Every structure is written in structure tokens, then in C-alpha cells.
Amino acid sequence: MNFVLSSLSEGLLWSIMAIGVYLTFRILDIADMTAEGAFPLGAAVVVSQIQAGTNPWIATLFALLAGMVAGLVSGMLHTKMKIPALLTGIVTLTGLYSINIKIMGSVPNLSLGDSATVFKQLASLGLSNEEAVFSLSLACLLLVCLVLTLLMKTEIGLVLRSTGDNIPMSEANGVNVDTMKIVGYMISNGLIALCGSLFAQNDGFSDVTSGTGTIVVGLSAVIIAEVLIHDLTIGGRLLSIGIGAIVYRLIILNIYEIPNLDQNLVRLFNAILLALVLFAPELQKRLKIRGLKLRNE
């Protein structure tokens, strides 16, 4: 039971990051590599702040804000300096590597030791550690989905979505496209850093390399959600990403259960899985077209 709860909790935690990836990948139509630097940034900030005596909840908020600053930098590089989106993420990611190490006191990883975390504080109310992680992960996912759903129904949210759908049309209607892109970058990377901070508190340490593969997990969760469940409102789509993240996590756990698996091949399996997941929508289209042709014959 604890194993199942732990797996669900980890999937729910990943879903927060996946929603951040969704905002740039689907809403803004941008492949943002900043995620791989924002994730360990959140972890580095929360661990260093907790060790400095900051309340874990405040430290988690600082991690969220740090991620938004990283998103601001990426947004400025992309919109004001006209650096292509993919290269923008790589530039910010490279810079964040050094920044994250400096935040952690010039060491590549930093342990929380016996310091308080948001999960330990919840567990002190009578919950087991697994129940505390699951409860807070679910609460965070629901809160993020609620806030973003409400935001997307406001004028700012509608403008943000139109920016990703049709830039020329948005500009023709007087929308400041650059500002909207920057806002999208900030929200996205803020959520990714928040996820990194929660993972660091759950794992008990931060590591400068913890963001490696983050974009793979996020994209996989988003595509799995889209393949499994179609035609949803924005709120439903955000919630479905949580399901996608859980499914992805369960698939990865099954890969780890393969007998005599060489651990060096795990990332190869991850890459193959992502390729298959990305191909799934195209496969669905081909099968649908083929089915229509057979009916017409």
C-alpha cells in the first residue's frame, strides 16, 4: 500500500512540473529547455533557505519566485534579444548550473539532514510520511489547476492563449506579444521550480544535476494525457496532465522491475518511451484516416 501511495505521490509531484512544461509547449508553442535548470534551482533555493532557518513554507515560496525570475530571464532573452526559443533555454540552463552551485554554497549537492520540511510538518499532524506527501501533492495539483483555470478565463489568460495560437492576429489586435510570452515563461518556470523544491524536501537533499531529463518527463506526461483523454476544457486538460504524469511514473517503475536491467540503459528506455509517446498522436491520425477510407470503399 505504501509503495502504491508513494508512486501516486511522485506522479502527482511530477504533474506540477508537467503543467509548467504544458504552458510553454502547448499554450505558447515553445520548446523551453529552461525547465532543466529551473527544477534544480527550486531545489537549491529551498534547501539552502531551510538550512538558513527559514520556515519551509516560506522557503518553498522563495523557490517558486526564483523559478519565475529564471523564466523572466529566458523570456527577455527570447523576446528582447531575439534569441531562438530553443537556444534561449540552453543559454539560461547553462547559466543556472553555476548559479545553483553558488546557491548551495559551492557544492554540487546539499543535504537537509534533520531540518523541518513541509512534509514533516504535515506528518506531525498524525499522518504517515507517505500520506503527508500524497496529501500535499494532491492539494498543490488541485490548487495549481484551479488558479490557472481561473487565470485562463481572464483577459490576460485569453490573450496569453491567443498569443500561442496566432501571433500575427494577436499583434493586429494590439496585444503586446513579447509581454505575454514573458508572463508565460515566468509562470511555467515558477511551477517547475516549485516542483523541484517539493522533490528536494521529499528526497532530503538538492542536487545540481536533478533537472536532467525534466523536459522528457514533462513532455511525456502532457502527450500521454492528450492521447488518453480528448476534447477537454482548459481545467480538465490541466487535471488530465496529473493522470498522464502518474501513468508515466508507473511505466518507468515497471521498466525498473525488468530482471537484470543495466541501470545505464534506463535513460535509453526513457528516450524510446518519449519517442513512442510523441508518435502516438500521429499514429492515431493515420488510423483514423485509414478507417475513414475503408468506410468509403
Question: In which residue ranges do the predicted regions lie?
Answer:
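Cytosolic-side transmembrane-helix boundaries in multi-pass membrane proteins
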Residues: D165-A172, N176-T179, L239, I251-E297
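Membrane-interface helix caps of multi-pass small-molecule transporters
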Residues: L23, S48, L72, M76-M81, ...
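Helix-loop-helix "hairpin" substructures at the membrane interface of multi-pass membrane proteins
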Residues: A70, E130-I215
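Single transmembrane alpha-helix segments in multi-pass membrane proteins
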Residues: F3-N55, T60, M76-M81, I223-H230, ...
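Alpha-helical transmembrane segments within multi-pass membrane transporters and channels
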Residues: V21, T54-T94, I99, G244, ...
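Loop-to-transmembrane alpha-helix initiation sites
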Residues: E10, L86, G113, V133-L138, ...
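Transmembrane alpha-helical segments in multi-pass inner-membrane proteins
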Residues: I192, G196, N202-R267
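Transmembrane helix-bundle core of multi-pass membrane transporters
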Residues: A85, G89, L96-K153, V183, ...
